[in-house]
Regions:
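Glycine-rich beta-strand-turn "strand-cap" elements at beta-sheet edges
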Residues: 2, 30-48, 70-95
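Generic structural motif
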Residues: 11-13, 56, 87-88
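Compositionally biased, low-structure terminal segments
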Residues: 21, 63-64, 83, 93
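Short, well-ordered beta-strand segments in beta-rich or mixed alpha/beta enzyme
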Residues: 2-9, 36-65
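Short amphipathic alpha-helical segments
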Residues: 12-36, 67-70
Length: 95
């Protein structure tokens, strides 16, 4: 599986989330298959976005697009870090 891990700070989580949700269709059309949103334990505006993509090339193209740069600015995203990952292994433990 192909993953993108994004770590960034936002000015206001509620505003960011509203804009993030409004971009669902364009993310899906670009190749995002699923996502999870996390926050740092004691920093509510420090966001981690982990998503599964159909390909890392599509993800890179999407995240570097001028349209998304504008969306990030509107959403108050500060200094995003993008990490492109290929899954090697998954493990589960029986309980």
């Amino acid at each position: 599986m192909k993953y993108v891990l994004i770590i960034h700070e936002v000015t206001d989580y509620i505003i960011w989330k509203r804009i993030f949700d409004s971009a669902t269709i364009i993310r899906k059309e670009a190749g995002e298959q699923s996502y999870q949103i996390f926050k740092y334990e004691n920093e509510p505006n420090k966001i981690v976005h982990l998503s599964v993509w159909s390909s890392l090339e599509k993800a890179k193209h999407f995240f570097q697009s001028p349209e998304l740069v504008q969306i990030r600015a509107k959403a108050g995203v500060q200094s995003p870090d993008f990490i492109y990952l290929e899954q090697l292994e998954t493990g589960f433990y029986n309980q």
